[in-house]
Swiss-Prot record:
Belongs to the anti-sigma-factor family. It catalyses: L-seryl-[protein] + ATP = O-phospho-L-seryl-[protein] + ADP + H(+); L-threonyl-[protein] + ATP = O-phospho-L-threonyl-[protein] + ADP + H(+). InterPro entries: Anti-sigma-factor_SerPK (IPR050267), Anti-sigma_F (IPR010194), HATPase_C_sf (IPR036890). This is Anti-sigma F factor. Its EC number is 2.7.11.1. It comes from Bacillus velezensis (strain DSM 23117 / BGSC 10A6 / LMG 26770 / FZB42).
């Protein structure tokens, strides 16, 4: 059975935790393991933070869009902004690369996404925004609740 959720919110730093918790709550119906849930929450946090800090350069007028589709123990996430886009996607995907060193950003966001998810696709064009598509196959075993 397929189940979908769509979320739209202002590109404000304080909305990052809202996005993370909302996605985690929606995914909980598949009974993921704690590790799987933590990885997905971390990826959502990284992608949303990238949209706010880099995509909109903290311009509160922007919107962040999240779509989640659950189907047969697979989570499909799309996180999109309509910000400034990424001029050099290959460079941006390199570990430790950041365009905002003055903000003490680690430059590990895309690396974390690629390590925690089964598939990561990034589409971006300057002045057109960025769309990140992520796929995670959940284990069929049930989470243990003690």
């Amino acid at each position: 059975m397929k189940n979908e959720m769509h979320l739209e919110f202002s590109a404000l730093s304080q909305n990052e935790s809202f996005a993370r918790v909302t996605v985690a709550s929606f995914i909980a119906q598949l009974d993921p393991t704690m590790d799987e849930l933590t990885e997905i929450k971390t990826v959502v946090s990284e992608a949303v933070t990238n949209a706010i800090i880099h995509g909109y350069e903290e311009n509160c007028d922007g919107k962040v869009y999240i779509s989640v589709t659950l189907e047969d123990h697979v989570v499909y996430l799309t996180i999109r902004d309509e910000g400034i886009g990424i001029t050099d996607l290959e460079e941006a995907r390199q570990p430790l690369f950041t365009t905002k060193p003055e903000l003490e950003r680690s430059g590990m966001g895309f690396t974390i996404m690629e390590n925690f998810m089964d598939d990561v696709t990034i589409d971006s064009s300057p002045e057109m925004g960025t769309t990140i598509r992520l796929t995670k196959h959940l284990s069929k075993s049930k989470a243990l609740c003690n």
